[in-house]
């Protein structure tokens, strides 16, 4: 069921990666541009927060859109450069990477603007 939901979200953006659910994944999700593959942590339904799952998938969708728009090799190069800059500034390669920050902001904006049931209420906030 979760795979169908992920596929439906990604289809909205005309994204069609290989979708893998992995119980042992050490992060919520990750996108592998070279293989056009997204791996989502398979959390049991009773422990899944639907909003968090949506935002996670949207976050990865932004990476896919960036890779498609820039080209995979250029995206990977820019991502690595941003990670190196973060480390040089004594920050975290992943968490402080500008591509991760942009993807997270975009995911929240998309969720509130399109996917959320109460999107009309959040537009004015």
Question: What positions do the PLM features span?
Answer:
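Short active-site segment of divalent metal-dependent hydrolases/proteases
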Residues: 58-62, 66
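Zn2+-dependent metallopeptidase catalytic core
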Residues: 1-16
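Short helix/loop segments within enzyme catalytic domains
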Residues: 93, 106-125
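N-terminal first-folded block
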Residues: 25-27
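Predominantly extracellular/secreted Zn2+-dependent metalloproteases
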Residues: 18-22
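OB-fold/S1-family RNA-binding modules
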Residues: 29-33
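Post-HEXXH active-site segment of zinc metalloproteases
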Residues: 51, 55, 67-101
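Short pre-active-site segment immediately N-terminal to the catalytic Zn-binding motif
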Residues: 38-57
